[in-house]
């Protein structure tokens, strides 16, 4: 993502709601990095006021924003997360206003301080182990392989999968080929934990060298631990294969299951 402008200035929307009072006096910037389908605006520059984020989803994306609100409420007991300021839901739209976690994303830190890569990966591994240690019996959300495959097939059948955004390994593949090759990797035994669902470098926040929280938790749920490991491993590949190897070492896996890893990355292409 380093080759694109991560934010562009934008104007404040008119919501005509009790949320409006919290929006006045801020400067606005539109996020260009997220791929959730929602619009994400950063609110900043208001004297003596914290930075905020406003996420808006329409249609099916409104359900995704609602899912994130519900998971934020549940996850706050276990992990450092943004705080919900307001949530509005109508039949077609959802708006979620949260506090910002101060700092920079792991991606930004790795770009600015490439020599800190090993320390960053070590912190990510510790944080991920903490997340995966949440008792599965406490989690009310299912994000397992079967659930995600049903969602993926629906998106494929409705033409919602963007083949132009596939990883380099699958560049030029039709969606149906990814679906076919993915199923060749089945079956395998699940190793279920509470997962983030999109444990990417852009969703992990560092401040003063410490990993202090995560964002974008709309896919939190019980799934195989490789749901998180594979996505983070893939992100680290933009920087160095040595960081990818270190991730598994520090997480505590001596022999990564490449079958699970590749399955997860193929499945993620559908979202």
Swiss-Prot record:
GO molecular function, one term: kanamycin kinase activity
SUPFAM superfamilies referenced in this protein's UniProt entry, alphabetically: Protein kinase-like (PK-like) (SSF56112)
Active site: 198 (proton acceptor)
Enzyme's top EC category: transferase
Reactions it catalyzes: kanamycin A + ATP = kanamycin 3'-phosphate + ADP + H(+)
Record bears the keyword Cell cycle: no
InterPro entries registered for this protein in UniProt: AGP_Transferase (IPR051678), Aminoglycoside_PTrfase (IPR002575), Kan/Strep_kinase (IPR024165), Kinase-like_dom_sf (IPR011009)
Keywords tagged on the record: Antibiotic resistance, ATP-binding, Kinase, Nucleotide-binding, Plasmid, Transferase, Transposable element
GO terms, biological process: response to antibiotic
Record carries keyword Endoplasmic reticulum: no
Protein EC: 2.7.1.95
Family according to the record: Belongs to the aminoglycoside phosphotransferase family.
Function of the protein: Resistance to kanamycin and structurally-related aminoglycosides, including amikacin.
Protein name listed in UniProt: Aminoglycoside 3'-phosphotransferase
Species of the source: Salmonella typhimurium
